[in-house]
Structure formats: structure tokens, C-alpha cells
Amino acid sequence: MRVTTSFPLGTLRDTPSEAEIISHQLLLKAGYIRRVNSGIYAYMPLMLRVIEKISAIIEKELNSIGCTKLLLPQLHPADLWKKSERWEGYTAGEGIMFNLKDRQGKEFGLAPTHEEVITSIASETINSYKQLPQCFYQIQTKFRDEIRPRFGLMRSREFIMKDGYSFHSSQNDLASFYEKVSNAYENIFKSCGLQTVGVEADSGAIGGASSKEFMVTADAGEDSILFTQSGSYAANIEKAVSLPSQPIPLKDNIPEWLETPHQKTILEVCDNNNLDPSQIIKVVIFLAQFEGEFNVPILACIRGDQHINEVKLFNLINKLNHFNLLNLKKIEDKKTIEKNLVDLPLGFIGPDLDNNTIKAISNWEKQWTRIIDHSASDLSKFISGGNKVNFHKVFQEFSFDSKDYLIGDIRNAKKGDKISVYDDEELKEKKGIEIGHIFQLGQKYSEKLNAKFSDKDGQLKNLWMGCYGIGVTRIAQAAIEQNHDQKGICWPIHISPFEVIIIPTNLKDPIQSDLTEQIYSNFLINKIDVLLDDRNDRAGVKFKDAELIGIPFQIIIGRDSINKEVELLCRTNNTKLKISTDKLLETFISESEIMYNKKS
């Protein structure tokens, strides 16, 4: 392809102000994407070629394990999502689904995911165990109404995703296929030239018994990964479990009540009373908002040197009630407190806070649900707020009576924690970008959408189901996070828009011009993915653009063309070879094969 006729590069000299991370900056500067609105981007010709190459790698690998490609609608009727009980959660409050009504007033949503639609189709087309297992996938645009779109294609409102769905006759068959997909994903990411790590993950709004995320390790990642050096354990921080450090025991001579004037934080209490945060229980107020406007006030208790993991807390609360939990928010604002609570001793709240602090006129449930982290419940003696302003109290143990009382893991695991009492290995931490997520959904959707099959004995059973996602546009940007330098992008050759770019330094020179056309034609004949920069710009402009857009190889045609010699430059390591034109094709094929075979 020629730059002048097919690929107006549209490179920028200045870094766009809205771009916060290097990959976003380079995508914009190199002309791969153009911002249309917040979280909405146009994929320019170079970017589209990258997307197509990533998609081809995905298709090849999934087809090899028996998956079948299809295309599902993006506009979904609300009725399907109401059957799965996800409509309100995805559209109300901070829900991420764009939704609308048609001319007849019927509700629809723009799909962020396709579990409902594919399960509905499966219920109509799969009726016997003889048809199982089945796996379908698609690659298409998805929509999510992000509260704060940022980082370019990392968190956008419109993006390209591969989503796949499998159906099985048994849990064992699902688990077996899940591992096949996991292995296929590892091959896909290696073929894309990425360094990834698979981690245990929370299933979130998708649901299911277990799930695994695939992370690209990068400093710009929004997710934290906790792992052991040996590789025996790795998990997203939302899911990670560990043992907290040992607490420092309280001394016996501490009085039952401590006067703590104006000491509202754990640090202030510790500094003024010669205490350690591990000896104190902090209590945090949350409101759990369930479907049907059912609001439950929560007292979450955790050791003072630890932090609450709101994802774990959400999941634990969701098990307490048969209603669908829509939202969990920390109660901190004065207006909400004054409207719903009375005589609340902020900064001095204890785990035995009286239910009478909830106002009778409030639309909250009239008793606290108390959730205690293991780090707190394991303490035989501790200090917490005394439920009186300026006072803290020494508790012997969690012995107060409450029918709404639950002990569980609501703690953030952290770097330095041990993974078990049997293992001295400590957790390490690094940042990651999620590019893939796989789930064992079980029968969550088949039960609600009546997707059944007849087994060998003629019994009707619910289908077992898995789902598998890959962020196609995320892969492209994540690849840049791992492959760039001060000059620009350094694409892995497997997903680069072109394998090589030809750069003549002076097309007005007839010798250069003729040699350029000969090389270009020869590469096309040999099915090399080649871009010719045939602009009449200065050589320096072409070199800068070539470095910025990051095509793996450059063929530079300059003054030595009179001797039928050119330079072959490798963008990744900046090595240059001066080669006679009769050896150029052979040398390029050899060098590019080395790069193709060098997967991450």
C-alpha cells in the first residue's frame, strides 16, 4: 500500500492534552485513533489493520478447539435481561448499559455482553445431549456507559471485543472445556507478542462459580495483581486471599474505657495512647441497595491495620438476601447521615452500635447488619469506638447478640502477606491491564431463561454454561504499553499494521525512484505486508513518522541506491544492515521469521 493513496498518516507533533498514559498518547500521535467524544474513538486505517490481525489470531486459535463464529444483535430487548434479573442492575444507578425505548415504548439495551441472547437462542436450538458441547463466539462492537471514560481504549464507551459462550451437559465437561479455552488464550496472547499472567478473579456482574483474568503486566495498569515469586499463586486484588500479619496483643492493664478527645482516626488514637493499629477495630458504614428499593445499613468491622475490600463485601452481602444487590456505597456524606441516622458518634462508632440510631422515618431497614472480617473476629481482646463521642472501649471479644451477624473475608490482601500458615512465601504486587476474562457460569442463565436439554435417560436438565471474553482493542493498546520507546511504538510483528515500511529519501532522484518501485513490487509479489512512504516530504519527516507508527522493519533507500544498496533497519533494537538489493528479500524474510518465532 502507498501512503499517498491509501494511508494518510495523520501523525501529530504535539502530545494531546487529554491522553494520560503513554499508549493513549502514542495511539493519538501516530494517527491510529481519533477522538470523536469522551470514550468514543474512530479507528483509522492503520488501527483497523492491527484490529484485523488480532482478530485473525483469535479466530485461528478458537477454531482449532472447535468454536464456531457467529454474529449476535447489539440491540437487546429488556425482557430477556429482566428474565435473568440483570436489567435493573445494569441500567439503574451506576449501571453501565445504554438503554432506550422504541416508538412503541418497548425497552431495549445496547449490549455490553451477550449471555441473555445466546442462552435464549440455545434454548431454542439445543435440545439433546447429542448436540453438546457447543461453543459460539463473535467479534463485534460493545457499548458501556462508563462513568469516567479514560486511558483511550482501556476504558471507553464503545470498543471491540471477542465474546464466546459454551454449552455443556455436565459440570465436568464445562470445567474441561474451560481449561481448553484458558490454554487457547495463552496461545493467543503469546501470538500477539504480549507478556501476560493468568490470575484468579472475581466473577462480578457476569456471575458464576469461578473465573480467571488474563493480565498484561504494565505500570499503567488499573488493576493490582498479587502473586508469589514461585508462580504457585496469582490473583486480582479483588479476589486475592492471604493471612494478615500477627497483631500485637493488648496489655492487661488497659482500662475498659479510654477517653480519646478529638481522636477520630486510628492513627490519632494510637499516637495518643501508645497503641498499635492491629489492636483496634475500625467500623465503616455502608448502605446495601437491593432491587425493589430495599435498603440495608451495614456495619463492616475490620482490624485497624487492614483495609476493606468492597468487592468481597458486596459478594458477602449478596448472599444474605434473596433480592438482587444493585449497589453498595460507603455512607460518608453529612446529608445522608442526618436524614437517616440519629445521635451517630462519628469517629467513635463501635461494632455494637445500637439499632435505635436508625431513624424510624428512614427508608432503611431498622437494624444494622454487622459483618466482621476474620482479622477482627480472631482478636480475643481489642479496642473500638465506644459509641460515645470522645470515648473508645476495650472489648473482650465479639460476644454481643445479633441475628444479623456474619463473619467472613472482607479484607484486601496486600504485598508482604503470607499465602497460608503452611507456606512462608510472601505476596508480591504489580500492576496489570485486563485483556481477557473467562468464567464458569454454571446454570445461572439456563435456569432463568429455561435453556434445557434431554440427557441420555430422557431427563430434562439445565444446560451448563461458560463464557469467555477478550478485549480486542485493549490488546492493541496494551501491546503498546509493553512495546514502545522514546521515539514511538515498537509493534510486535504479529499484530503490526505492516511488516515493513519502505522509505525513499529523495523520490526526485530517478535512480532512487526506480529502485523503490522495484523493491516495492518484488515485496508485493512475495506477499510481504509492505507500506511505501511515497510522500515528497523531507527524509527527516519520514523517519520520524516511521519511528512513531512503529512498523517493525524499515527499508531506507538513499544515496547508496546508485550502487544498488539499501539499509534494513529493525525498529525494535535499531540495528542496521547495509544490503545489496539482490539479497534484500532473502535477508528480510530471514530476519522477520526470527521475529515471528520469538513470541513472548
From Swiss-Prot:
Gene3D superfamilies per record: Anticodon-binding domain, Bira Bifunctional Protein, Domain 2
Reactions mediated catalytically: tRNA(Pro) + L-proline + ATP = L-prolyl-tRNA(Pro) + AMP + diphosphate
Top-level division of the source organism's lineage: Bacteria
Stored InterPro entries: aa-tRNA-synt_IIb (IPR002314), aa-tRNA-synth_II (IPR006195), aa-tRNA-synth_II/BPL/LPL (IPR045864), Anticodon-bd (IPR004154), Anticodon-bd_dom_sf (IPR036621), Pro-tRNA-ligase_IIa (IPR002316), Pro-tRNA-synth_IIa_bac-type (IPR004500), Pro-tRNA-Synthase_IIa_type1 (IPR023717)
Assigned EC number: 6.1.1.15
Keywords on record: Aminoacyl-tRNA synthetase, ATP-binding, Cytoplasm, Ligase, Nucleotide-binding, Protein biosynthesis
Localization per Swiss-Prot or TrEMBL: Cytoplasm
Top-level EC class: ligase
Protein family according to the UniProt entry: Belongs to the class-II aminoacyl-tRNA synthetase family. ProS type 1 subfamily.
Domain notes: Consists of three domains: the N-terminal catalytic domain, the editing domain and the C-terminal anticodon-binding domain.
Protein name: Proline--tRNA ligase
